[in-house]
A protein has these predicted regions:
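Helix-rich terminal scaffold detector
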Residues: 1, 6-13, 171-299, 303-309
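Short, glycine/charged-enriched hinge/interface segments at domain edges or termini
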Residues: 2-11, 19, 64-221, 367-368, ...
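Intrinsically disordered, low-complexity, positively charged segments
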Residues: 7-74, 154-155, 349
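Generic structural signal for well-ordered, non-membrane alpha-helical segments
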Residues: 9-17, 30, 34, 56, ...
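Flexible glycine/proline-rich
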Residues: 14-17, 30-35, 39, 44, ...
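Short beta-strand/loop turn elements enriched in aromatics
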Residues: 30-34, 52-74, 107-121, 353-377
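Solvent-exposed alpha-helices and their adjacent loops that cap or buttress functional pockets
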Residues: 56-58, 67-69, 87-91, 104-106, ...
């Protein structure tokens, strides 16, 4: 008797996530301009090439005086603007007008704010000397060689500004993923078309495209006919992206119906099937496959199930591809309203709306009727986790959820 095929069993969410974290690997790194690096993951630490700031500089607009000169009246002998370099030895009774960011002309100095002096343009009279001396000292932000940005950091505007300030014009970042998305189903028509009887508009293609935007994926989308032979021929053409895609997403055809051929299509092109179904609701018909470093998902065609699988599983792979490590998907929050359980035998991911109240996530379950229900997704920004066969959840109960608008 042959042993049971482990792929044939239904995987739970944790098992699929653990598998994806194990098999997905960071993509290659490349050097790009700062403009192209926004949102990408840094693949090497960035160190300060010199002290930051590299010289003592004024933190205010004002006048430079000697620390050991306790006088109140001074003669203006020079002016230093930001970008000037004018070293000099100040004598007692002398001052230099200085702009914010200007390099101090020497050491053992103090900057008096312009608000604390009276001046006729040639001399000043100090009315108040505050401590400290309004100076940003050399190296007070970072010393030469100090790590400024760690590897595996996602680059946001503030980080990019720091890189620019230390001359890192071409940081080493993870390249963007190449994704091929195949939509299946003869009933699908373009959103701008009027469906005939038995047809529906394609909502999954824009769902996939918009979902991929945070990872800046290079996306190729095409439709496959509901004919396996024709589909295979189309994917074998020289211009097919199947050979170069890092990630293959197939919408629909992941179940076991007579016209569902996603699994056999993947096997035909040499993909090893790792998962053939899950114990989730919605999202039971899910396929996970691998060919070398390429990963593939056969996603359920129903939009809500599609949405759930993208946020639970495809997101994990994209984060691993980017180099930022394992994704911490689940967060905890509090239910605002009671959720009546239908005692379903499968773990359910329920569309919900969450808001932060005093740093605590509060979740409101949204109504949904089936895995094809799109109306709840218009306002959903979370998936509420409901355990299999669970009891009703009262308002105020602590629950797990996955944020979806990130």
């Amino acid at each position: 008797m042959n042993p049971p095929n482990p792929v044939a069993r239904a995987f739970n969410a944790e098992e699929v996530i653990a598998l994806l974290n194990e098999i997905a690997q960071p993509l290659a790194a490349e050097r790009v301009t700062l403009e192209a690096a926004a949102g990408r993951v840094l693949r090497e630490p960035v160190c300060a090439p010199e002290d930051q700031p590299p010289f003592d500089r004024s933190a205010v607009d004002g006048f430079v005086v000697r620390l050991d000169d306790a006088g109140s009246e001074f003669q203006i002998v020079d002016e230093i603007r930001a970008g000037d370099w004018k070293p000099r030895q100040l004598q007692r009774g002398e001052t230099v007008r200085i702009s914010t960011g200007g390099a101090l002309p020497g050491e053992q100095l103090q900057v008096v704010m312009k608000e604390d002096v009276q001046t006729d343009g040639k001399t000043i009279r100090v009315t108040q000397r505050r401590q400290p001396g309004n100076i940003r000292f050399r190296g007070e932000d970072a010393r030469a060689g100090q790590v400024l940005v760690e590897s595996n950091t996602t680059l946001h505007p503030g980080t990019l500004a720091l890189l620019a300030s230390v001359g890192q014009a071409k940081p080493l970042v993870t390249r963007v993923p190449r994704v091929l998305h195949l939509a299946t189903g003869n009933e699908i028509v373009a959103p701008e078309q009027t469906p005939e009887r038995g047809q529906i508009r394609d909502s999954n293609s824009i769902l996939v495209r918009s979902f991929l935007q945070p990872w800046q994926a290079g996306l190729e989308q095409t439709r496959l006919p509901e004919d396996e032979t024709i589909a295979k021929t189309k994917l074998q053409t020289p211009n097919s992206k199947l050979q170069t895609a890092d990630l293959l997403l197939i919408s629909g055809g992941a179940s076991v119906g007579e016209h569902d051929f996603t699994r056999s299509l993947l096997e035909h092109f040499g993909f090893e099937i790792l998962v053939s179904k899950t114990s989730l609701r919605p999202g039971k018909p899910l396929i996970v496959a691998r060919r070398g470093n390429q990963l593939a998902f056969g996603l359920p065609g129903n939009p809500l199930a599609h949405f759930v699988c993208l946020n639970l599983f495809v997101r994990v792979v994209l984060d691993k591809f980017s180099g930022c490590g394992n994704t911490e998907l689940f967060q905890t929050g509090t239910l605002v309203a009671k959720l009546e359980s239908d005692r379903n035998a499968r773990e359910t991911f329920w569309p919900a709306r969450f808001e932060l109240n005093h740093r605590q996530a509060e979740l409101t379950p949204l109504r949904w009727s089936s895995s094809g229900d799109l109306t709840s997704l218009a306002t959903a920004n979370a998936l509420l986790r409901v355990k299999a066969g669970g009891e009703d959840l009262a308002a105020g109960a602590t629950v797990e959820f996955v944020p979806t608008n990130f």
